[in-house]
Amino acid sequence: MNQKNIYNSWIVRILVMVLLLSFGILLDYLINDIITNQGLFTVLFLFAGMIVIEYARGGSFHTAGFPLDTKTLQEMMLAVVLGMMPIVGLIIVLSFFDLAHISYCSTFPLSGLVPIIMYAIIEELIFRGMIFQACIDRFSFAPTALLFSTIFATAHISNPSFDALSMINTFLAGLLFSFARYHMRSLWLPIVLHISWNCTLFMTGMTLSGLEISESFMKINLSHDIPSPWLMSSYGIEGTAYCTLALIVMGIIISTIDVPPQRQARIFRMEYTISS
């Protein structure tokens, strides 16, 4: 390893990113009463830190996890579909069997989507960003994915109605996002997938990670006859066996996607330069 650049050290990258994360959270906390920023500074500090450190290592925003190539748009569109279809599909099936009744709200504040989007981005930048990549460089993908998915699941433990199946599914979601990041050499897929999933739950008024949605585009009134925890739970769809199956299927679909060769080439060139 080229020791002249301190940012080639995995531990230095982690320490710098943790410091930037702390600054971002502190700023968001201090000015939240003045400006409803919804985690804006945390996102900016994490994103800017990743880009600056990657350029300092000889990389670019491409190798930092934000490649712009022929696959990027397709990757984002797939993420949107993967995030929506399991939820929309379940609603359609439940409605067909008269187990769910849909009503539409006359007013829907679009501003409610802002924290949903921002917190999904923050979680992905923390759990699948540069800290995640630095640990992969040091310990390889499998142990890193297991560790970060465990932390990701544990971070949701204080959510209402969190139980064993919710824990398993949140852990599997962490593995899914981690695999998407590693397989595609990109953060686009996990970020957009996470946003799509959360926004779909929010807009349909369904329970999101145990949290009840008070204002949404529509309201789904669910029958008490829906088998639990197979198709629904007090934690929402994320606490069901259906969600477990959906996460596994999504992982299989993602594994079939071909990674653009230019992504691999950029990373290889940077790693070759670092090691030479």
Locate predicted features.
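Alpha-helical transmembrane segments and their helix-entry boundary regions
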Residues: 9, 75-76, 130, 144-145, ...
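Generic transmembrane alpha-helix motif of multi-pass integral membrane proteins
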Residues: 48-52, 130-132, 174-184
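Divalent metal-coordination and catalytic microenvironments
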Residues: 64, 124, 135, 156, ...
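Residue-level signature of the transmembrane alpha-helical core
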Residues: 80, 84, 113, 117, ...
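Functionally important transmembrane alpha-helices
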Residues: 166-229
